[in-house]
Every structure is written in structure tokens, then in C-alpha cells.
Amino acid sequence: MKNQHNTFWVLCLLFVMFDETFSAFPFGNGRIQFDPIRENSSDNIECFLDYMELWVPRKQINGLVLWLSQIMRFPVSLSSLDRSNQQLSRCKYFLDADADGNFLFRVHYTGCYVQTQEGFYKLEIHMVKKTSSGRGQSNRYLMRCPAMTAQLGREKLRCDPNYVQVSRPIPLGNSNDQADWFFSLRGELVVSIEDASLIGVEVDVSNSSVTVSGLRGQLLDGIKILDRQIDNLHLWLAHGFYAYSLEASCPSVSQHPGEEVILHIPKQRVGLVKRGSYSADILTLKNLIVGQSANVTVTVTENKQFVVINIPSHEVLQRQDCYTTIGNNPGVQFFYCIDLVLEFTEMAYPINWTLENYYECSVRVPQMIQPKPTTAETFHKIKLELHTTPRSETRTALVITPTQDNTLASTSVTLAAKLRESVHSAIVQESSKTEMSASGYDAELDHVASGEYFNRIEGSGYYAETNISAALRLRKCHHL
């Protein structure tokens, strides 16, 4: 009886060993064995406003590379990451190595195969592993991040002749840990929030917003962008490995703008970014909304760092009474307040941007300027579809200026109640080419190397206004 009992357990053990051994080898030539899907450890994934990032140990990177090569239909190579990332960018993927030889896999929420389910962005990835028999085995992982509100995509900028003020929402939604944050001015001067006055920055922090201000002469640096002199604020709020942009640009100080109002908007992501990573980011303008009175004509120019918008002065300029600094004489001060919403191809959320700019008080009113009375605010939206074909050299300015001639190197864009049914040709100066048409938001996914199309699943997220304290509200312009 004892021998029969031992024989039973031996047979059970052999059966288990047989089952475990052969379950690892799928039947059928070239077939891949899939393990049950599992969520990746929260220690390995980080969620940002526009994208999620997966940390991949170097011992597992070959499995990810094999999977990417299969779905992209071209060989992804770790030895030529720049070339591979050019192809991966078509699906809004990015692969980068860290100092320890491990890798970061970045996926934008609007990338290929990203799905939205129950308030989360999800992407199923496969770590493919080749077995000794040549067959593939795959571990399935689920990258998952919550959809966030777009409150970080708001910026209010006020430029006065003597000082500048920038307001943005708190990047983490509260100010409880503000002691751990510090400012970086011009990439060199680093101080804590409490010591910001040492670099000429006044800080006002609420539960939802941070407002910085200071004298223009201490904070702003004169730079030249597309043959135009501007004053630039290069200020970042940093915390550990992350940074949050407070960059802004003001027009140079003068008594009047001339025939055109020119806005310089730094290209920047709306949420936290890895420190140092923002310098390699390239953002492409996709859509523009102008919150002004009817028939506002806009000329758009962009390069790698800035979006530049030209508006005729008489369409936005206002005036108010003032007293001159010298002599305290009564005069006239010109100003404008402009609301813009900018949408970039590489970002899941728009940027809501407001600029108030005040010129110096002038005793004499220039006759060339006739401010146009503003009426009730009406939004006019142009839907742009831009395709950029970068050349081998660094991408520089895309110049778009009004013209009726197809032989000239530009295209005119008019924001009005009714958009033109078509726009003319556009060629881009220097190192890139852009085609623009009023044809809606979404473009089909570009061809990959094989010439095939991928199914693109948009990570739509959601966009909502936020409740911000009245004292620091990022208000829109008040048009009289």
C-alpha cells in the first residue's frame, strides 16, 4: 500500500514537470507564446501631462526593440538611435538611453495604439524573447496613466515698461511641498522659492497658482528672433529631476508698436518635463484660436523655439489716459490684451496663452495709429494641418507671410468669421518645408518605411477650466 502511494506521487510529479516543460514551447512554426497581460510596476513608469515614460532595464531592451521592429516594419537599432527615433516619431514614440545603460521608452498619449478607457491612457506592449528553438516568446505589459485636466496649459503674461509678471498653475496641483522647489534663472542662478528675491524674483503662491514678477532690467534678456528684438525671460521652476517652464517673452519697450503687433510665444510643454529633456523637444504648431473681435488678420511664423504672430495694430490696439514718468504730464498710453489658444501636433492638450502689453506713456499721439474699438469677445478658429519634412540640417524658421502669388515663398492666413476655402502655396526658407491648409485637425498617420499605414487611436483626454482663486485668476482679456 505504501509503494502504491509513493508511485502515485511520483506520477503526479512527472506529469507536472512534463506540463511545465512543454508549455514553454508553443506548437506551430514561428508561433509566439503570450504570457497573461500584467501591468508594469509603478516604479518603472512615470506619467506626464502629454506622455508616459517606461524605464526599461538593459537586459530587457532587446525584447522591446524586437516588438517595435515588428509593429513599425523597420529594424529598430540601438546603435543608431537618432535614425530609429526619426522613424519612431511617426508613431510618437521615443527611445533614449540613460547614463547607466538602461533605456527610457516615451509614448505620447496621441501615439499609435494608445487607447483611452475609463479615464486612463493605455498601451499594451510586448517584450519579445527568442527561444533556442527560434520561436518567439512574449511577455505582455500594460502602460497605463490617468488622463489629467489641462489646467497646466494656461499662462498669463503682463509686460509693463518697467516690470514683468507671469502666472501659471501649480504643476503638482498644490503648494504643500513648495519648500522642495527652486528657481533656475538663465540656467545658472539657482535659489529656493523662499530666497527668490536674491535673484530679483517676487513670488506669490496659492493652492493652485504661482505668480512671479520683477523688474524687466533684472529678469529679461534682449535676444533677436527672426530679425526682431525682444526681451526674454528664461526662468524655470525645478524639483528633483523635473522642471516646469515659466519662460515668457515681452516686446521691447517703446511708445507705440508701429503698424503691427508682434507676439513671440516660446514653444514649451504645458506640464512637468524631465530636466534637460526639453532642450531636445520639437513642437509643431497645428491649430490656432484667437479670442479677439471679428476679422482679425494673423500672420504666423515659427522656428524651433518660438511661434511668432503678427497682427495689424489697428485691429487690437487700445488706449488709456496716463501721466508721464518725467514731468507728470497727462498723456496717452497704448496697450493691448490678446487671448490665444495654441495646439501642437506633439501635445495632447492646448496652451491657453494671454498677453497684456503696455507701452510707455506718451504726450503726443502718433497719427499713424487708430485704435479700433473692441466689441464682445468672439473666438475664430482656424484649423491647420501642417506637414513638416525636415532636412538633414537643423530645422529653422518656417516663414508664412501674406501673398496672392503662388511663385512667392509664403502663404497668407486670415482668421475671420468665414475661412477661405483654400490657401495658396507655401515654401519654407532655409531648412524645412511646410504645407498648410484649412482642412481640420486630424491627419492620417504618415507612412512608415514599409509604406504601410498604422491604425491610429487618439488619446483624447479631456479639457476643463479650473477653479483658481480670484486673486491670481488667469483671466481672459476684457474687451470693451
From Swiss-Prot:
GO cellular component terms attached to this protein's record: extracellular space
Signal peptide: 1-23
Subcellular location: Secreted
Tissue: Expressed specifically by cells of the ciliated left-right organizer.
Gene disruption: observed consequences: Knockout animals, generated by CRISP-Cas technology display no discernable left-right anomalies.
Keyword Secreted: yes
Keywords: Secreted, Signal
Keyword Signal among UniProt keywords: yes
UniProt cross-references to InterPro entries, sorted A to Z: C1orf127-like, DUF4556, ZP1/4_Ig-like
Entry-linked PANTHER family: GENE 572-RELATED
Protein name (Swiss-Prot/TrEMBL): Ciliated left-right organizer protein containing ZP-N domains homolog
Naturally occurring in which organism (per UniProt): Xenopus tropicalis
Gene field: ciroz
